[in-house]
């Protein structure tokens, strides 16, 4: 078909064909190689390819590929969380997170999300919820460890085994063991308590298709506090073959504040919205709100080089 004539799309289809024939998506040399090639192929952002306008055959392939990526990512996190949790009792697993292949990406993403959040909040959040935290809750860990030293993180996941592994990661840390709390529940069953959080993160892998993603967002809108911030992961350009896209039209009941598309090796785009009904704050077409003061953590801030900071400011300028 015509929409498959693009060379890059052909490469993605070929990789999908190979991945879909794998007997297992658990970490192995073959699995790691194929997904590594897939990510590298999908990273370029200087393309005019719009995955939402492709033919139905490619759209169906993309939907299946996103599910395969999510399954493989879950196995990868489970694998490394198990290894880290099995370290000797006198070792803190959080001191060895660098063994996870994509840890540096989470450091960058955490820094990016903290900076974006600080642009749209006048106070430091005291309680944050992360929905879909998984067996290796790296976003919560990075934010708690490097950026928000006094914030409590409530991590929600439907999988009790994932929460057990995640809890083992932080149980030996004198600080995070007190500030990381885990809840085993389906977010769609969580009706009470969601209004306690200043910020709610919705993981990219919660809602692997448009219908289920919108359903999760609608549920959060119904139960979050007015004025609370919702942070979501989306995808842009070819990266949308790896993760679902969150559009502004999906955010009914929220004021869209920012959509930021990284151009480096951070795959996910970041979407920030505010639940309507709270104090009025400028959105994507207005001026920014007050910035709360970040913690003095130069170690992690050094992760973002000057070029990365410049790109971020330019992106803000384009949005505004």
From Swiss-Prot:
InterPro entries: Nicotian_synth, SAM-dependent_MTases_sf. It comes from the Eukaryota. The keyword Transferase applies. In shoots and roots. Keywords: S-adenosyl-L-methionine, Transferase. It is an enzyme of class 2 (transferase). GO terms for molecular function: nicotianamine synthase activity. Its EC number is 2.5.1.43. It catalyses: 3 S-adenosyl-L-methionine = nicotianamine + 3 S-methyl-5'-thioadenosine + 3 H(+). GO terms for biological process: nicotianamine biosynthetic process; phloem transport; pollen development; pollen tube growth. Gene3D superfamilies: Vaccinia Virus protein VP39. Coiled coil: none annotated. Induction: Constitutively expressed. Belongs to the nicotianamine synthase (NAS)-like family. Synthesizes nicotianamine, a polyamine which serves as a sensor for the physiological iron status within the plant, and/or might be involved in the transport of iron. This is Nicotianamine synthase 1. It comes from Arabidopsis thaliana (Mouse-ear cress). The gene is NAS1.
């Amino acid at each position: 078909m015509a929409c498959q004539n693009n060379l890059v799309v052909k490469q993605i289809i070929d990789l999908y064909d190979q991945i879909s024939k794998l007997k297992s998506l658990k970490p192995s040399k073959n699995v790691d190689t194929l997904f590594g090639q897939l990510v590298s192929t999908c990273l370029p952002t200087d393309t005019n390819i719009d995955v939402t306008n492709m033919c139905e055959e490619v759209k169906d392939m993309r939907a299946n590929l996103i599910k395969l990526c999510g399954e493989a990512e879950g196995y990868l996190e489970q694998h490394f969380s198990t290894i880290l949790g099995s370290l000797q009792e006198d070792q803190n697993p959080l001191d060895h997170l660098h063994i996870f292949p994509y840890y540096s990406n989470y450091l960058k993403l955490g820094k990016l999300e903290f900076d974006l959040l600080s642009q749209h909040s006048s106070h430091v959040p005291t309680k944050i919820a992360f929905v879909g935290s998984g067996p290796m809750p790296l976003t919560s860990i990075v934010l708690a460890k490097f950026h928000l030293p006094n914030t409590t993180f409530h991590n929600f996941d439907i999988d009790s085994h994932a929460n057990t592994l995640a809890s083992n990661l932080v149980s030996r840390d004198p600080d995070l063991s007190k500030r990381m709390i885990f809840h085993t529940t389906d977010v769609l069953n969580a009706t009470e308590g969601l209004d306690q959080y200043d910020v709610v993160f919705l993981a990219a892998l919660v809602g692997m298709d448009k219908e289920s993603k919108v359903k999760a967002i609608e549920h959060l809108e119904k139960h979050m506090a007015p004025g609370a911030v919702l942070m979501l992961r989306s995808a842009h350009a070819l990266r949308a073959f790896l993760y679902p896209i969150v559009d502004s039209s999906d955010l009914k009941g929220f004021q869209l504040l920012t959509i930021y598309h990284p151009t480096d090796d951070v795959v996910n785009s970041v979407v920030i919205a505010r639940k309507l009904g709270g104090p009025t704050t400028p959105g994507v077409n207005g001026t920014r709100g007050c910035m709360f003061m970040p913690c003095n953590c130069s170690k992690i801030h050094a992760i973002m080089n000057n070029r990365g900071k410049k790109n971020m400011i330019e992106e803000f300028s384009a949005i505004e």
